[in-house]
Amino acid sequence: MGNIKSFALYISILLLIVVVAGCGKSDKTKEDSKEEQIKKSFAKTLDMYPIKNLEDLYDKEGYRDGEFKKGDKGTWTLLTSFSKSNKPDEIDDEGMVLYLNRNTKKATGYYFVNKIYDDISKNQNEKKYRVELKNNKIVLLDNVEDEKLKQKIENFKFFSQYADFKDLKNYQDGSITTNENIPSYEAEYKLNNSDENVKKLRDIYPITTKKAPILKLHIDGDIKGSSVGYKKIEYKFSKVKDQETTLRDYLNFGPSDEDS
């Protein structure tokens, strides 16, 4: 009788161990799936890269939800900016924003030049230069006397026009941060300088540090899709004070502005 009780106790303990181990494995799987969810969420837009002709976006539709009014075909918003600290206590930030309205098939936006100071009282000096997209070329609408700046604007290329994320699924062991209350999700990957996108960025921008960047995939909003939230890519080459160097890219689809 005693042997039967001992055997029953042994079986109970064994079952408990199996259940606990299973729960732990389930949690691990759930955590792993969060990384996959982030990559799959980004893949919906990154699979389109490189978008060599931005006007192709007029024929592409993104995620739609109840925020869209009836008949609204939606608007694509693009942003690419490069920020770098060239002097102590300040960061130079330049880039372009473009709105491609699928209803009107017009694309307008602006190129911006900004200095960000540690002394926030100085942070009111952003300059904007209006642009439009015609035949896949940036057309400057404002008069710019600085010939170097004028050429930079007219020859500007968005990151989405030359980046390629065909290997996104192979990025592994990312550092995952989530906040379900906002909600927001972020995956960080340590890259190396042999990465094709990194090499392209080094060819285009004055990146002086030899350190390989960290790639951040950031989502604000429903990870499955939302026209209210946004997705942002960051290549952070340096976050050392007075050496900050970052490339930001943003491609999102949302309801059209009635005035656009």
Swiss-Prot record:
Transmembrane segments: none
Localisation per UniProt entry: Cell membrane
Signal peptide: 1-22
GO CC annotation: plasma membrane
Keyword check for Signal: yes
Superkingdom of this protein's organism: Bacteria
Keyword Membrane appears in the UniProt entry: yes
Residues with lipid group (N-palmitoyl cysteine): C23
Record lipid sites (S-diacylglycerol cysteine): C23
Keywords, sorted A to Z: Cell membrane, Lipoprotein, Membrane, Palmitate, Signal
Membrane topology reported for the UniProt record: Lipid-anchor
Main localization of the protein described in the UniProt heading: membrane
Pfam families: DUF576
The family this protein is said to belong to: Belongs to the staphylococcal tandem lipoprotein family.
The protein's name in its UniProt record: Uncharacterized lipoprotein SAR0438
Annotated organism of origin: Staphylococcus aureus (strain MRSA252)
Source species taxonomy: Bacteria, Bacillati, Bacillota, Bacilli, Bacillales
